[in-house]
């Protein structure tokens, strides 16, 4: 598995544990993913994969209009993709 795929899978696994209706902050995702992968991915690597997963509609994000902070959740398509792994 290449590094990008490993990071994407770690993100999907992390978001799969978030209770329905709730969102996970960018910072929380980064911390959890960095603990799962050795060597730990950089912030830029994780941000790139978050954007790619969003473009693929496997996750969806909501931006706070005041702080700019992103919060994420896994989509049904993301759950299905994770089940295929």
Where are these regions (language model features)?
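A short, conserved structural fragment
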Residues: 54-64
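Short, amphipathic alpha-helical interaction segments positioned at domain boundaries
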Residues: 76-85
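Short alpha-helical segments that sit at the start of domains
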Residues: 1-23
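Alpha-helix C-capping/helix-to-loop hinge sites
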Residues: 14-18, 36, 60
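Short acidic, hydrophobic short linear motifs in intrinsically disordered regions
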Residues: 21-34
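Short amphipathic alpha-helical interaction segments
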Residues: 39-56
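Minor-groove-contacting beta-hairpin "wing" of winged helix-turn-helix DNA-binding domains
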Residues: 66-74
């Amino acid at each position: 598995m290449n590094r990008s795929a490993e990071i994407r899978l770690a993100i999907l696994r992390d978001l799969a544990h978030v209770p329905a209706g709730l969102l996970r902050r960018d910072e929380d995702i980064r911390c959890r993913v960095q603990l799962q992968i050795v060597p730990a991915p950089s912030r830029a690597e994780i941000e790139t994969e978050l954007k790619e997963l969003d473009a693929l509609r496997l996750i969806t994000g909501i931006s706070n209009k005041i702080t700019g902070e992103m919060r994420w959740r896994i989509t049904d398509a993301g759950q299905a993709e994770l089940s295929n792994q």
